[in-house]
């Protein structure tokens, strides 16, 4: 079973985060204490691509697990993010560009004159919600939590419904001129060193049951495969299946009685010899 995928909706004018981190504790509903230790750990989701349409990545996963080369080229063609250019009035105007907006990296620290804003980067927090628009439970929406507020970003479908409602009521649209993109984060088997900036933290209390069960099933399958390849594990199983594995090392009753009589006879001979000496 493949690991779940996270999707984050953000404004095109904002920079994406390079990775999302999730730290899970032990699940009290797990059957075995050994399995609970397997489920606990830190998970790393790496930014793989940025899309303009939210249904492109999901469509590829519904059709086949491995996209073709043509699909990959089409995906990269959608990852072109529009850049901002100011007009005479100082108002940012969205214009198409061939340059892709990239998150700051460690190499950018030496090239930028003012790194104070980057070094003071505070890790944004995300909460995970189910994605009811897909048939599979692999893709989940990660909603960014606003700093200083308890409300979350609206769901992509809920956002479109609100915009449609406001447009029918002839009300002004506050975000009608803003473009949005979708960042796709895939789980990585190898967790690198946590960067000092440009990463997000997932709230462990907001993990849906389907998301957590997907992680747990993947860990269980990996644990079973590793146990099968372990020769020591096979040797222990073979010994435990043997009848003599559970037998104690105590002597039989007849052997114990014979040894006791021999010891008593030897003790009496020694005592008699000491008496005559």
From Swiss-Prot:
InterPro entries (alphabetical): Iwr1, TF_Iwr1_dom
Cell compartment(s), UniProt: Cytoplasm; Nucleus
Composition bias, Acidic residues: 251-277
Residue ranges with Basic and acidic residues bias: 225-234
Region called Disordered, residue ranges: 222-277
Function in brief: Directs RNA polymerase II nuclear import.
Record family assignment: Belongs to the IWR1/SLC7A6OS family.
Protein name as annotated: RNA polymerase II nuclear localization protein iwr1
UniProt source species: Schizosaccharomyces pombe (strain 972 / ATCC 24843)
Taxon lineage: Eukaryota, Fungi, Dikarya, Ascomycota, Taphrinomycotina
């Amino acid at each position: 079973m493949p690991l779940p995928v996270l999707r984050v909706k953000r404004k095109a004018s904002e920079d994406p985060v390079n990775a999302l981190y999730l730290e899970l504790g032990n699940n009290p509903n797990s059957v075995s204490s050994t399995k609970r230790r397997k489920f606990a750990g830190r998970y790393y989701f790496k930014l793989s691509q940025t899309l303009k349409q939210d249904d492109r990545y999901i469509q590829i996963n519904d059709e086949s697990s491995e996209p073709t080369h043509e699909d990959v080229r089409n995906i990269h063609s959608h990852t072109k993010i529009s850049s901002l250019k100011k007009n005479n009035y100082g108002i940012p105007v969205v214009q198409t560009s061939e340059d892709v907006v990239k998150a700051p990296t460690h190499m950018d620290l030496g090239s930028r004159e003012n790194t104070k804003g980057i070094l003071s980067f505070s890790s944004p927090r995300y909460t995970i919600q189910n994605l009811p628009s897909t048939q599979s439970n692999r893709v989940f929406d990660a909603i960014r939590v606003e700093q200083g507020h308890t409300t979350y970003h609206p769901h992509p479908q809920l956002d479109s419904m609100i915009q449609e409602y406001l447009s029918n009521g002839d009300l002004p649209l506050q975000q009608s001129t803003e473009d949005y993109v979708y960042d796709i984060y895939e789980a990585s088997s190898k967790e690198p060193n946590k960067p000092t900036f440009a990463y997000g933290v997932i709230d462990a209390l907001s993990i849906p049951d389907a998301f957590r069960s997907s992680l747990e099933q993947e860990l269980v399958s990996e644990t079973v495969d590793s146990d099968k390849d372990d020769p020591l594990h096979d040797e222990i199983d073979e010994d435990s299946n043997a009848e003599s594995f559970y037998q104690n090392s105590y002597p039989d009753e007849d052997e114990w009685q014979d040894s006791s009589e021999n010891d008593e006879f030897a003790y009496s001979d020694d005592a008699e010899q000491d008496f005559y000496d």
